UniProtKB/Swiss-Prot annotation:
Substrate binds at Q227, H239. The lineage of its organism: Bacteria, Pseudomonadati, Pseudomonadota, Gammaproteobacteria, Enterobacterales. Binds 1 Ca(2+) ion per monomer. PANTHER family: INOSINE-URIDINE PREFERRING NUCLEOSIDE HYDROLASE, URIDINE NUCLEOSIDASE. InterPro entries: Inosine/uridine_hydrolase_dom, IUNH, Pyrim_hydro_RihB, Ribo_hydro-like. Coiled coil: none annotated. One of its GO terms (biological process) is purine nucleoside catabolic process. Pfam families: IU_nuc_hydro. One of its GO terms (molecular function) is purine nucleosidase activity. One of its GO terms (cellular component) is cytosol. Its cofactor is Ca(2+). This is Pyrimidine-specific ribonucleoside hydrolase RihB. The gene is rihB. It is an enzyme of class 3 (hydrolase).
Amino acid sequence: MEKRKIILDCEPGHDDAIAMMMAAKHPAIDLLGITIVAGNQTLDKTLINGLNVCQKLEINVPVYAGMPQPIMRKQIVADNIHGETGLDGPVFEPLTRQAESTHAVKYIIDTLMASDGDITLVPVGPLSNIAVAMRMQPAILPKIREIVLMGGAYGTGNFTPSAEFNIFADPEAARVVFTSGVPLVMMGLDLTNQTVCTPDVIARMERVGGPAGELFSDIMNFTLKTQFEYYGLAGGPVHDATCIGYLINPDGIKTQDMYVEVDVNSGPCYGRTVCDELGVLGKPANTKVGITIDTDWFWGLVEECVRGYIKTH
């Protein structure tokens, strides 16, 4: 089996933590590094959350802090969903794990430039780190094998009627990425909302147990409350984890090639991913857009990763 080399760019974040857990354990993924961006909460908080998850699950991968602000817009956070810490719910041991001193953007540039073009970027938060890296060193563009991102929607948004949070948090950065010419795969809300983590899924992971089962339970029981409160959902979708699922086995997720453009005009559609589903613009497709996911397969994959953290000795 070919291991996909990835850099996971995230803003933990409840579903980010599930993506980290899966990426670090599945044998099909070679997780080179974790870069952190501001998003669900401010950078100081998302960094601590990322380090806490790595410490609890003994994920021995370097962690790099990145952009603390969006490129242009005023910063927003998703504390309504993720709480004051950005990862409310779990209680962690005192933190001893530390981030690397190198800036995430420099790490992304240096790693890509030294590569053979075989590294996939997996940004599951606002695209600030990726866009700044692209602007600082355009020579990375042909070095990126693929970008598999969580963000956007071809239907309704979740932070405004038009926009999904990750894109709305930094639309200008998203515009840079979507016009980069790099092969893109977009897991938008239309797909990720199919992965609602209901109480029976939580119970299934609790039965598996181990440190990842415990963390999964603490994380997803918190989002049960907030997702029902704000969106009327029967549980929290594990949005970001769908990107890892796609990388492990793209056959589990149906995609459609579309031309996607990010609206950066101020107004009610600011931050919208405009997806030309019918091809009416006649522009060449630049994105594989996730349409449907085999949820039985997906939860089986999550369980497999949770089970991987149980120590046998």
